[in-house]
Structures are given as structure tokens and as C-alpha cells.
Swiss-Prot record:
Its EC number is 5.3.1.6. It comes from Streptococcus pyogenes serotype M6 (strain ATCC BAA-946 / MGAS10394). The keyword Zinc-finger does not apply. This is Ribose-5-phosphate isomerase A. The keyword Isomerase applies. Homodimer. Substrate binds at residues 26-29, 82-85, 95-98, 122. InterPro entries: NagB/RpiA_transferase-like (IPR037171), Ribose-5P_isomerase (IPR050262), Ribose5P_isomerase_typA_subgr (IPR020672), Ribose5P_isomerase_type_A (IPR004788). GO terms for molecular function: ribose-5-phosphate isomerase activity. CDD domains: RPI_A. Disulfide bonds: none annotated. It catalyses: aldehydo-D-ribose 5-phosphate = D-ribulose 5-phosphate. Gene3D superfamilies: 3.30.70.260, 3.40.50.1360.
Length: 227
């Protein structure tokens, strides 16, 4: 599995060229993309500027000598590579297993080409077997938890040890155990309209390419262009 993740990450790095501003994703597969960019910066003199999606990735990139900029200092990103926890046949996905979904979505939004790197186990018919992360403000989080419970979403607070995990943006995460999300777009809109929800892990219609590594090799899937 580790080898497949590395292959996917290294393959994605081939899309990066001199002068690009690149979004650096978070998670076990995106890790290898960032490592490969670091190698190219050091060994090939690759000239890029990175925008990171978490404090973990910032630390990794700084250690590799990748120059970084804040999202607030750029207007567009040429290419972002990130992992995904599930991807369906319509190129909708669940992200946020690493608790970085808000920053990941903020970086994805001004990106011209958005690529996910996954191993074949992440490709699914329907989203929902992986718990859907919902980032919520701390104020009123318990009330919101009860709202989700009443709706049958089987919520649980993301924990770190004995305490609730606090994200880089100082929010909580409530994971929803939905089993199957029949209409991810409609459910995304529902969560978008829920007061107290900062962001959710449904990334619908955002990705341009999905690089899938399996024991048979690497496949690059292209999402159909909108319109």
C-alpha cells in the first residue's frame, strides 16, 4: 500500500514545471508528492512556490527547502496535488481524514488544475463508507452534534487522545457515519446551509484529474469538463 501511494505521489510531481505556484496537500499519499517536489528542488533546481494545506505539510515543506507563500499572498495556484479518502464515479470525493479539510478546500478553490493522488482502494461506487468529516465552530458544537444525531447521521467527535481534536483553524470535527451518500451534491448543500458548520469534507465537482495507483500500474482519470 505504501509503495502504491509513493508511485501516485511521484507521478503527480511530473506535472510540476518551473515557475509554478503549487498547492501542497496533506495526508499519507500527498506526503510523497511533497517529498518528490523537495527532491527536485534540491537536485534539479526546480523553481516553485508552495502553498500548504496544514501545519504538518508546512513543516514538511520547510524541512525540504521548498519556498512557501501564504494563501493570502497569491491570487491563483497553477496546480494542487492532494489525497482523497474516497472518490466516486462522478469525481466527487470525501476528504478530511487528516483533519485539514478547511485549508484543503481554501487552497483548492483558486487552483487551475486540481489533482488527487490515491491508491485503488479509494475508488468507490458510492461515497459514505468513509466517515464524512464536518468542521464546526466550538461554540454550539454539542447542540449541532445532537441535531446530527436526531437526523440519523451517527455523529462522533474526532478525538486526539482523551480530548476533542482541535484543527489548525481552532475548530472541532464531527465525523458522520452515513454508510452511503446517495446524492453528495444535495447533501453538501444541506451542510453548507447549516449554521455552525464551517466546512465539510465533500469535494464535489472540484477535481480535474485522479491519479490511481494499483498493483497493475498507474491510471490517470480525467474528470469531464463542466458544461
Amino acid at each position: 500500500m505504501k509503495a502504491l501511494k509513493k508511485i501516485a505521489g511521484v507521478t503527480a510531481a511530473q506535472y510540476v514545471t518551473d515557475g509554478m505556484t503549487i498547492g501542497l496537500g496533506t495526508g499519507s499519499t500527498a506526503y510523497y508528492f511533497v517529498e518528490e517536489i523537495g527532491r527536485r528542488v534540491k537536485q534539479e533546481g526546480l523553481q516553485v512556490v508552495g502553498v500548504t494545506t496544514s501545519s504538518v505539510t508546512s513543516k514538511q515543506a520547510e524541512g525540504l527547502g521548498i519556498p512557501l507563500k501564504s494563501i493570502d499572498d497569491i491570487d491563483s495556484i497553477d496546480l494542487t496535488v492532494d489525497g482523497a479518502d474516497e472518490v466516486d464515479k462522478d469525481f466527487n470525493g470525501i476528504k478530511g481524514g487528516g483533519a485539514a479539510l478547511l485549508m484543503e478546500k481554501i487552497v483548492a478553490t483558486p487552483t487551475k488544475e486540481y489533482i488527487w493522488v490515491v491508491d485503488a482502494s479509494k475508488m468507490v461506487e458510492h461515497l459514505g463508507a468513509f466517515k464524512l468529516p464536518v468542521e464546526v465552530v466550538q461554540y454550539g458544537a454539542d447542540r449541532l452534534f445532537r441535531v446530527f444525531e436526531k437526523a440519523g447521521y451517527k455523529p462522533s467527535f474526532r478525538m486526539k487522545g482523551d480530548s476533542r481534536l482541535v484543527t489548525d483553524m481552532q475548530n472541532y470535527i464531527i465525523d458522520l457515519d452515513l454508510g452511503c451518500i446517495k446524492d453528495p451534491v444535495a447533501f453538501g448543500h444541506l451542510l453548507d446551509g447549516t449554521v455552525g458548520v464551517v466546512e465539510h469534507g465533500l469535494f464535489n465537482g472540484m477535481v480535474d484529474k485522479v491519479i490511481v495507483a494499483s498493483k497493475d500500474g498507474v491510471t490517470v482519470l480525467e474528470a469531464p469538463k463542466a458544461g
